[in-house]
Amino acid sequence: MQDAAPRLTFTLRDEERLMMKIGVFVPIGNNGWLISTHAPQYMPTFELNKAIVQKAEHYHFDFALSMIKLRGFGGKTEFWDHNLESFTLMAGLAAVTSRIQIYATAATLTLPPAIVARMAATIDSISGGRFGVNLVTGWQKPEYEQMGIWPGDDYFSRRYDYLTEYVQVLRDLWGTGKSDFKGDFFTMNDCRVSPQPSVPMKVICAGQSDAGMAFSAQYADFNFCFGKGVNTPTAFAPTAARMKQAAEQTGRDVGSYVLFMVIADETDDAARAKWEHYKAGADEEALSWLTEQSQKDTRSGTDTNVRQMADPTSAVNINMGTLVGSYASVARMLDEVASVPGAEGVLLTFDDFLSGIETFGERIQPLMQCRAHLPALTQEVA
């Protein structure tokens, strides 16, 4: 493993920066985000995700997000071949939590916007106003070809035009309960949705291409991006700067939320040993599938999420930023994340979710300057 060269020093600039939000990226697919025969092997279940999100709520995580995946990568680990569905999972989790924000992901090629608008309004009712929607255009062609709904490869270059119309229909229906939108992709004829959400519905996205960031700048409440490298917590800063600049063009404030995997232990050496063990068990067959799919989109440029996911540097965990170290080291690196202009939060995954969240809440978070505002824990977690 190649760590960053000297550790960056930083100064948290103001009270706002001392309050970075933390979310958990729940394992809706088997084995979470480690494509390795040496990683924990498990199936996704409601009970597992309920335990994860209830622990996250106990430790004052701000939000939980689930992705949507409709076809996996295969290989020895059958990576992501087994997946729950995002909206129904998050509806269930909304009913068994009370404070944490809940986000489901809409694969927009599979669901008409009027149906998503109604499902979101329903989960808003279940959660008491704690629900939001992550919109994805879809990049893995076999997910949609298997159902006969892939619109053709021209979609790669038009997908944000499609998503722009999609979100306009959503905003109409959530805002007024009615839409007569007419576009290239959608035609609404006195379309109605009621009841409407009790609070303004948050829309999030994960654009890293120029087109994706332009969409987020115009329509999203915040934008997810990948962290980069191993123990290089501020390497994503140019991406956050691009998002900040794009948002300035629209006169909106759209912060970046950064995806990281945490692999922590008592010492740096113990954590590093875990990471090396996971890398040694990389499922090469599944990784080959990911690489193959990343090459299908020849029209969206070189800065898309899927291109980063398939980079061989750290493909074993789809090249999300990886923080490997002692509890104190991980806390320090997360504070460095908080120092980056435009970074408003992080979305965390763990090599082992249940023990990872507990360790984070008990051993890492109390050391973080950017979480010093949290109240003391007062109850037992289930």
From Swiss-Prot:
Q: Which residues form a coiled coil?
A: none
Family as reported in the entry's similarity comment: Belongs to the NtaA/SnaA/DszA monooxygenase family. RutA subfamily.
The protein's matches in PANTHER family, at most eight in alphabetical order, are given as:
ALKANESULFONATE MONOOXYGENASE, ALKANESULFONATE MONOOXYGENASE-RELATED
- Extract the InterPro entries matched here: Luciferase-like_dom (IPR011251), Luciferase-like_sf (IPR036661), Pyrimidine_monooxygenase_RutA (IPR019914), SsuD_RutA_monooxygenase (IPR050172)
Report what the protein is called: Pyrimidine monooxygenase RutA
Any idea which positions bind FMN?
68-69, 134, 143, 159-160, 209
- Pfam families this protein is in? Bac_luciferase
| UniProtKB keywords | Flavoprotein, FMN, Monooxygenase, NADP, Oxidoreductase
On the tree of life, the source organism's domain of life is Bacteria
Question: What role does it play?
Answer: The FMN-N(5)-oxide reacts spontaneously with NADH to produce FMN. Requires the flavin reductase RutF to regenerate FMN in vivo.
Which reactions are catalysed by this chain? uracil + FMNH2 + NADH + O2 = (Z)-3-ureidoacrylate + FMN + NAD(+) + H2O + H(+); thymine + FMNH2 + NADH + O2 = (Z)-2-methylureidoacrylate + FMN + NAD(+) + H2O + H(+)
Q: Which gene encodes it?
A: rutA
